[in-house]
From Swiss-Prot:
Keywords: Cytoplasm, Metal-binding, NAD, Oxidoreductase, Zinc. This is L-threonine 3-dehydrogenase. It catalyses: L-threonine + NAD(+) = (2S)-2-amino-3-oxobutanoate + NADH + H(+). The active site is at residues 40, 43. Pfam families: ADH_N, ADH_zinc_N. It is an enzyme of class 1 (oxidoreductase). Belongs to the zinc-containing alcohol dehydrogenase family. Pathway: Amino-acid degradation; L-threonine degradation via oxydo-reductase pathway; glycine from L-threonine: step 1/2. PROSITE patterns: ADH_ZINC (PS00059). Its EC number is 1.1.1.103. It comes from Yersinia pseudotuberculosis serotype O:1b (strain IP 31758).
């Protein structure tokens, strides 16, 4: 079958032929319709330090997808041939304390689809049936293909009560923009997003944020004054991994504020801990999606009117995958979807 693989320990990704994956007793096989390019896939393409430590070569990559069930393992119940599915990309062990306690997103033995085992940039993907999620009929293939990153946004945004709250989102990448849209949809008062990438900030404006602030040109304190805010933000979502953005977020939080962190800062990042301690801030780390509460919320949010379509900015047939990666690497894109149909 055709697949996009990391074939060499250098920059790039290559189309190749690989054997079709084998089906286990508890697995389903999915014929891929559409895939989306994740920031992780760009790291793998660039062959950065994290990729060099993590990714075995050769390896089929990709973990954002939608497809159709074409084969079912003999022990599988609840799925039928022809079901349209996406899937949770974190495969968990089922026997550690967190798995047995129902907190599977915190499994210490997590294996990543397209990171530690063959991924979805292929004609066929095999995953445990436990990880598959049926897509409702009124959700398009394109939106279903971005459920994985949308889930990161939903998990982060819904970490805290948002109704009537003022929210600051640092980092206007696709996940940050989707998180901001979720906050607005569920009843936050002001949702402000910051970045230095004007293309992405324009995208955030299309998604309905209160203010999209280019911090290289505009002062966040002035924006808060303009919005009539006198005490700082109630909720902060750190989506950038950039130390200056996180420090600015800490400075802008109200006392007792709550922060969810999805962005991954450098391990040696320094901050003013007085901002955390004397403000009584609560900081929560976010990894992946809650299984499967986040997935049900994703579907419900779209079905209740949340419009994510502006975040998908580029579409290519799979044979033009290089253009898709070029768009993602340029910084002038939202989500990029590749069609395998």
């Amino acid at each position: 079958m055709k697949a996009l693989s990391k074939l060499k320990a250098e920059e790039g990704i290559w189309m190749t032929d690989v054997p079709q994956p084998e089906l286990g007793h508890n697995d389903i096989m999915i014929k891929i319709r559409k895939t989306a390019i994740c920031g992780t896939d760009v790291h793998i393409y660039n062959w950065d330090e994290w990729s060099q430590k993590t990714i075995p070569v050769p390896m089929v990559v990709g973990h954002e997808y939608v497809g159709e069930v074409v084969a079912i393992g003999q022990e599988v119940k609840g799925f039928n041939i022809g079901d349209r599915v996406s899937g949770e990309g974190h495969i968990t062990c089922g026997h550690c304390r967190n798995c047995r306690g129902g907190r599977t997103h915190l499994c210490r033995n997590t294996v990543g689809v397209g990171v530690n085992r063959p991924g979805s940039f292929a004609e066929y993907l095999v995953i445990p049936a436990f990880n598959a999620f049926k897509i409702p009929d009124n959700i398009s293939d394109e939106l279903a293909a971005i459920f994985d990153p949308f889930g990161n946004a939903v998990h982060t945004a819904l970490s805290f009560d948002l109704v009537g709250e003022d929210v600051l989102v640092s980092g206007a990448g696709p996940i940050g923009i989707m998180a901001a849209a979720v906050c607005k949809h569920v009843g936050a008062r002001h949702v402000v997003i910051t970045d230095v990438n004007e293309y992405r900030l324009d995208l955030a404006r299309k998604m309905g944020v209160t203010r999209a602030v280019n911090v290289s040109k505009e002062n966040l304190n002035d924006v808060m004054t303009e919005l009539g805010m006198t005490e700082g933000f109630d909720v902060g979502l750190e989506m950038s991994g950039a130390p200056p953005a996180f420090r600015s977020l800490l400075n802008s939080m109200n006392h007792g504020g709550r922060i969810a962190m999805l962005g991954i800062p450098p391990s040696d990042m320094s901050i003013d801990w007085n901002q955390v301690i004397f403000k009584g801030l609560f900081i929560k780390g976010i990894y992946g999606r809650e299984m499967f509460e986040t997935w049900y919320k994703m579907a419900a949010l779209i079905q209740s009117g949340l419009d994510l379509t502006p975040i998908i900015t580029h579409r290519f047939p799979i044979d033009e995958f290089q253009q898709g990666f070029d768009a993602m690497r340029s910084g002038k894109s939202g989500k990029v979807v590749l069609s395998w149909d």
